[in-house]
Amino acid sequence: MSTKIMLKSSDGKSFEIDEDVARKSIAINHMVEDGCATDVIPLRNVTSKILKIVIDYCEKHVKSKEEEDLKEWDADFMKTIETTILFDVMMAANYLNIQSLLDLTCKTVSDLLQADLLSGKTPDEIRAHFNIENDLTAEEVAKIREENQWAFQ
């Protein structure tokens, strides 16, 4: 019987998972190794909806070691995630330091950006599609445009 780890999402939902699944996250792995995971690990930046997706991914990657099987499963798994929360999954993968999931979500976003789905859309339309808040001021946008003028020609 494997050791269990309790994770608590930002919206208060608890998830009890196997330690080997939790250790797919380098951040959680460090907490376990440092003895900080004695009770519940609070994940203040990850909602229960997103955490469930991350846990599903980690469980599959712990249980299956066949590279080809995982590639096919990963592709199918990404198709089940709504594009409006894909960015949140990416941010959770980054926060939890799960490099393989971060790489997968980045590739999926890149593929979507190159596909007809987002072709010809403005930055504001793309942000709306992925439910990304624009937290830059007009001055910051102007500075970025000035520093990267070559990209806007």
Swiss-Prot record:
Pathway: Protein modification; protein ubiquitination. Transmembrane segments: none annotated. It is found in: Nucleus. Residues 90-153 are annotated as: Interaction with the F-box domain of F-box proteins. GO terms for biological process: auxin-activated signaling pathway; jasmonic acid mediated signaling pathway; protein ubiquitination; response to auxin; response to jasmonic acid; ubiquitin-dependent protein catabolic process. The keyword Aminoacyl-tRNA synthetase does not apply. Keywords: Nucleus, Ubl conjugation pathway. Pfam families: Skp1, Skp1_POZ. One of its GO terms (cellular component) is SCF ubiquitin ligase complex. InterPro entries: SKP1, SKP1-like, SKP1-like_dim_sf, SKP1/BTB/POZ_sf, Skp1_comp_dimer, Skp1_comp_POZ. Part of a SCF (SKP1-cullin-F-box) protein ligase complex. Interacts with PP2A13. Involved in ubiquitination and subsequent proteasomal degradation of target proteins. Together with CUL1, RBX1 and a F-box protein, it forms a SCF E3 ubiquitin ligase complex. The functional specificity of this complex depends on the type of F-box protein. In the SCF complex, it serves as an adapter that links the F-box protein to CUL1. PANTHER family: SKP1. This is SKP1-like protein 5. The lineage of its organism: Eukaryota, Viridiplantae, Streptophyta, Embryophyta, Tracheophyta.
